[in-house]
């Protein structure tokens, strides 16, 4: 029999509210609506299907404060991650939302009504408390970045009535709700289930450690990867799921099943490990593997880990009895070539030869097309990874030129376009500042916010083209550091490489060589908000390349850019 849910009762709101579907659906059409973001959709799905039991809605302030301060809901239940619905003051005011109001929660993807929320309270989001107590306070932490840049200023708490399931069009047969997975376990006759959480592809070592964990406990394996939001730069879930499916036949017959979890990860380390254990308990698992630096975001810009390597294991162990799910500590295994087997590192005698490939080395081999040995990963898995991660010489990239008007950006961009077209191998797209203003941003002015929006539109186009394998050359003025950082994140977040080139031509030179007289007009006050005259240009903090047309020829600058790309592997090496 599957493990009992957290809190004793599976809060399957979809099943609970199904008899009232027509009534709720009709009411939802008459209510004001909040259109949910991708992360909010992930949270709502797991609230409605019981994955977040005992939650029945988004957290009130009492729940939020208790979870942040003590990992406790207001009713005393253990819960480690704030699950909140953020909204702007404008949305709240426009819809006249207040305690007691009912509001429809709507899917941004297809405009479907998903649920009705009865508002219990509206409270200001204490982002500082959440950042410090839940995630550790480092402003570079991805969850804290999200808090500070994406989350609105108010949280809305209240219980939910389910109207419709979210629509999914990928891997539908693998998207088990907690109730469905419990039925599946019963059908298979499984009573002991070891759940394995992952957001990465699995290789032979992962197969070995999960089999060992199951064998030691006379259990079966639930491979339960996250297919919601993970860490920026992770391999997309389509590729990962194909790789998991290819791996599944390598398990002993009937030992493992694959189920997909639509979770929006926060990369919250110890707090997240407790949360993951609760979620797996709700899905019926009796055991849960917690790895080294479980759900950690890696290192900050100083090379420091956000969490200690065993903080997550210690956190889950602290609440072992209350969680009601047995923690299985992730064993680091290594390959022994002399005996062609994997063993836990702490069981390998001194002097025995071992082999390992790090994640960084694997990415490098995928990037360069270098051999990936069968002792590390199965050929069918490697084939799938290579299909989605072609060698860098065939990948796209974005060259983002920034500098004053008339600094030489356009000349460099055009010359670079010709050079790359001559090189061949990928399509080349040119996004000049004036062209973008005319074709994409004609309605925008030159306020700070409009300039930021213009750069983000460029980044969106560049990211999509780069992901498709094109070379993109963008050449806006882009005077603000926050806009350039956001552009880099947008392109990198889609898996593309972004190179920031600061065309650091002095303002005096730009003015002196301005044949159109634009600077002169700005000096006379005929043009307002002109970069370098009455609006600042913030020099980039971390440019990949700095050039200067007053000291270098366009030809030599283009050569520098080509050399930079060549050193990063973007051209075939004979």
Curated annotation (Swiss-Prot):
The record marks 330 as: Induces change in substrate recognition on ATP binding. The keyword Protein biosynthesis does not apply. The active site is at 198, 199, 200. It catalyses: sulfate + ATP + H(+) = adenosine 5'-phosphosulfate + diphosphate. Pfam families: APS_kinase, ATP-sulfurylase, PUA_2. Its main location: cytoplasm. Its EC number is 2.7.7.4. Catalyzes the first intracellular reaction of sulfate assimilation, forming adenosine-5'-phosphosulfate (APS) from inorganic sulfate and ATP. Plays an important role in sulfate activation as a component of the biosynthesis pathway of sulfur-containing amino acids. The record marks 203, 206 as: Transition state stabilizer. One of its GO terms (cellular component) is cytoplasm. Residues 170-394 are annotated as: Catalytic. Allosterically inhibited by 3'-phosphoadenosine 5'-phosphosulfate (PAPS). It comes from the Eukaryota. This is Sulfate adenylyltransferase. In the N-terminal section; belongs to the sulfate adenylyltransferase family. Residues 1-169 are annotated as: N-terminal. Sulfate binds at residues 197, 199, 295. Homohexamer. Dimer of trimers. Keywords: Allosteric enzyme, Amino-acid biosynthesis, ATP-binding, Cysteine biosynthesis, Cytoplasm, Methionine biosynthesis, Nucleotide-binding, Nucleotidyltransferase, Transferase.
């Amino acid at each position: 029999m599957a493990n009992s849910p957290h809190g004793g009762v599976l809060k399957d709101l979809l099943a609970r509210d199904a008899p009232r579907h027509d009534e709720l659906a009709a009411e939802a059409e008459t209510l004001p609506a909040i259109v949910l973001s991708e992360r909010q959709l992930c949270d709502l799905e797991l609230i409605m299907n019981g994955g977040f039991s005992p939650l029945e809605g988004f957290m009130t302030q009492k729940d939020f404060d208790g979870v942040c301060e003590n990992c406790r809901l207001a009713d005393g239940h253990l819960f480690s991650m704030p699950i909140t619905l953020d909204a702007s003051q404008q949305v709240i005011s426009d819809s006249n939302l207040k305690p007691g109001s009912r509001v429809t929660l709507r899917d941004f993807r297809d405009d479907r009504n998903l649920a009705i929320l009865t508002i219990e309270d509206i409270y200001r989001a204490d982002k500082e408390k959440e950042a410090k107590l839940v995630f550790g306070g480092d402003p570079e932490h991805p969850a804290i970045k999200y808090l500070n840049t994406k989350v609105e200023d108010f949280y809305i708490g209240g219980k939910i009535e389910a109207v419709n399931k979210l629509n999914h069009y990928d891997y539908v047969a693998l998207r088990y709700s907690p109730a469905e997975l419990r039925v599946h376990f019963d059908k298979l006759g499984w009573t002991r289930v070891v759940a394995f959480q992952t957001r990465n592809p699995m290789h032979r070592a992962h197969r070995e450690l999960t089999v060992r964990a199951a064998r030691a406990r006379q259990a079966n394996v639930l491979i339960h990867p996250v297919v919601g939001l993970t860490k920026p730069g992770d391999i997309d879930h389509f590729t990962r799921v194909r790789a998991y499916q290819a791996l599944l036949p390598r398990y002993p017959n009937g030992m493992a099943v694959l189920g997909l979890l639509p979770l929006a990860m926060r990369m919250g380390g110890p707090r997240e490990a407790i949360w993951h254990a609760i979620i797996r308990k709700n899905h019926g698992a009796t055991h849960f593997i917690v790895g080294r630096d479980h759900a950690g975001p890696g290192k900050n810009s100083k090379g420091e880990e956000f969490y200690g390597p065993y903080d997550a294991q210690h956190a889950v162990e602290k609440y072992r009895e209350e969680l009601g799910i047995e923690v299985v500590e992730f064993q680091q295994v290594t390959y022994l070539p002399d005996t062609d087997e994997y063993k836990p590192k702490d069981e390998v005698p001194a002097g025995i030869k071992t082999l390992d490939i790090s994640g960084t080395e694997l990415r490098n081999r995928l990037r360069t097309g270098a051999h990936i040995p069968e002792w590390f990963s199965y050929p069918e898995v490697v084939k799938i990874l290579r299909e989605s991660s072609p060698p860098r010489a065939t990948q796209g990239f974005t060259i983002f030129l920034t500098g004053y008007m008339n600094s030489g950006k356009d000349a460099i961009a055009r010359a670079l376009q010709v050079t790359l077209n001559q090189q061949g191998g990928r399509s080349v797209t040119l996004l000049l500042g004036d062209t973008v203003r005319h074709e994409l941003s004609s309605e925008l002015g030159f306020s700070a916010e409009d300039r930021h929006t213009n750069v983000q539109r460029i980044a969106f186009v560049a990211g999509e083209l780069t992901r498709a394998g094109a070379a993109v050359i963008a050449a806006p003025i882009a005077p603000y550091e926050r806009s350039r950082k956001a552009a880099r994140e947008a392109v990198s977040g889609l898996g593309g490489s972004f190179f920031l080139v600061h065309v650091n031509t002095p303002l005096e030179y730009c003015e002196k060589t301005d044949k159109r007289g634009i600077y002169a007009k700005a000096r006379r006050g005929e043009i307002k908000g002109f970069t370098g005259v009455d609006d600042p240009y913030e020099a980039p903090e971390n440019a990949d390349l700095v050039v200067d047309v007053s000291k270098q020829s366009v030809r030599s600058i283009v050569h520098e850019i080509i050399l930079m790309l060549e050193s990063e592997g973007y051209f075939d090496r004979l």
